[in-house]
Design a protein with these regions (language model features):
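Conserved PLP-enzyme active-site core in the AAT-like
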Residues: 64-67, 73-76, 112, 136, ...
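Terpene synthase/cyclase
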Residues: 118, 155-221, 226
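Conserved acidic segment of CheY-like receiver
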Residues: 19-54, 59-66, 83, 124, ...
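Short N-terminal or domain-adjacent regulatory/targeting segments
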Residues: 1-26
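Conserved phosphotransfer microenvironments
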Residues: 41-48, 67-71, 79-120, 128-134
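Output/docking surface of receiver
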Residues: 8, 63-65, 127-132, 136-161
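Short beta-alpha junction loops
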Residues: 36-38, 125-132, 152-153, 387-396
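Conserved N-terminal alpha-helix of the aminotransferase class I/II PLP-enzyme fold
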Residues: 213-266
Length: 429
């Protein structure tokens, strides 16, 4: 994946969501947490009536009577379509032998745990009308609603919850995955590559039958060529492919994002082929990936290398800050006869690209804002090979230590590229 960010420009439009449903039925139950779920009292009968009304509308219910640590239930956020948490008014009375502050802290921790990973899943509290007066604003603002016990029919409340839960699940699939689901479920025959024709080829032999049953029909029907018009084009950046690229650019706070097959190695070569010409001077981390060495050879560029430190065990450390100064880079150019000759032929040209390994296999990363301050306008393109760092933009621990992110100042002149491998560490978050 290639992320690009350049000098200031107009803000991009927000990513539009069509809100259309997906044709496949996915399992996202409504989770109900109520100590009285199976108790023969008013609260128990009310919550069971609501659960039955939801099930009668075709939605699955996952009920629990004892939640223990609410934060453990919060881990269910990736599998649920909504949460309903029952709160009794007596939990806020000292006469019942309970600490109201403990109840609120437990509830607050539950909601914070969910919202830490999922800002959109519907959360409802269920209880008596007077119970809502005990709930502070910081909790209320995170809720989709407070269900007042017996103030409306279970059937009406169920339809409301299902509407919100369905809207949530319909908005989960990003554009390309949504289009792929539609295509695989549409019963379209496959007359192009790959030659297994949607898995039909595997049905002709016993071992093929095993293969088909192991992977499942959906995977094989979705294994299609990039010539499928309904899914858009990787090369032309059209249709659902383009919509997903725009969505990814929004998520990573980039101006543009391009999906690439064959990993970051190919992404690196694409960045170089689009920015570097034969005879251009390039500044390269000596501890670079071999795809950068391939790019140097393929483009005919003239490299000067930034040398990292190395300890007595042979472990490669960071490049000293002194190596990045324009003066140090100029000295390297003058010391390299090929680079010096290239600069003499075109003294008006600055080095075309800087490529830094961010991070190395040993976890060495650099302060990007510091490098931008040093080199913005001194080098045409600042390229960060972030094959092992795609997760950095999503955690404050890495602030300023990755190429592109929210609330980061733009370069004034230089273009910034980040190349990612989503199949390495991105899934780890």
């Amino acid at each position: 994946m290639v992320l690009e960010r350049g000098p200031p420009l107009e803000a991009p439009e927000p990513f539009p969501s069509d809100g259309a449903s997906v044709p496949m039925k996915f399992r996202f139950p409504v989770v109900i947490i109520d100590e009285d779920f199976r108790t023969e009292n008013t609260s128990g009968s009310g919550i069971r009536a609501l659960a039955k009304a939801i099930e009668d509308e075709g939605m699955e219910i996952l009920g629990a009577t004892s939640f223990g640590d609410l934060s453990q239930f919060a881990q269910q956020q990736s599998r649920a379509s909504a949460f309903i948490l029952s709160i009794d008014d007596e939990e806020f009375t000292s006469a019942a032998g309970r600490d109201p502050e403990h109840v609120l802290n437990n509830l607050r921790g539950f909601i914070q745990e969910i919202r830490l990973k999922n800002t959109h899943i519907p959360i409802y509290l269920y209880g008596e009308t007077r119970t809502s007066s005990h709930i502070p604003n910081d909790i209320l603002r995170e809720l989709h609603g407070f269900i007042h016990m017996f103030e409306d029919t279970p059937e009406f409340v169920a339809r409301h919850i299902i509407r919100e839960a369905t809207a949530y699940t319909n908005g989960l699939a990003p554009p390309f995955f949504r289009a792929l689901i539609h295509y695989a479920q549409d019963g379209s025959y496959s007359w192009h590559c790959p030659g297994h024709s949607g898995g039909v080829a595997f049905l002709k032999s016993p071992v093929g039958q095993m293969f088909h049953q192991f992977f499942g029909e959906n995977m094989l029907r979705a294994d299609v060529c990039n010539a499928v018009e309904e899914l858009g084009q990787l090369l032309d950046h059209t249709g659902p492919v383009a919509a997903s690229e725009r969505n990814a650019a929004r998520i990573f706070s980039a101006d543009h994002c391009y999906f690439v097959t064959n990993g970051t190695s190919t992404s690196n070569k694409m960045v170089w082929h689009s920015t570097v010409a034969s005879g251009d001077i390039v500044v390269v981390d000596r501890n670079c990936h071999k795809s950068i060495l391939h790019s140097i050879i393929m483009t005919g560029a003239v490299p000067v290398f930034l040398m990292p430190t190395r300890n007595h065990l042979g472990i490669i450390g960071p490049i000293p800050l002194s190596e990045f100064t324009p003066e140090a880079i100029q000295k390297k150019i003058e010391a390299n006869p090929f680079a010096a000759a290239a600069q003499k032929r075109h003294p008006e040209r600055k080095p075309r690209i800087l490529t830094i390994t961010q991070s190395t296999y040993d976890g060495i990363i650099y302060n990007v804002e510091m490098l931008k301050e040093l080199l913005d306008g001194k080098i045409g393109t600042l390229h960060f090979d972030e094959a092992w760092l795609p997760h950095a933009t999503f955690h404050t621990f890495y602030r300023d230590m990755h190429a592109i992110g929210a609330d980061r100042p733009r370069p004034k002149e230089s273009m910034i590229f980040a190349t990612h491998s989503t199949h390495k560490l991105l899934a780890g978050i």
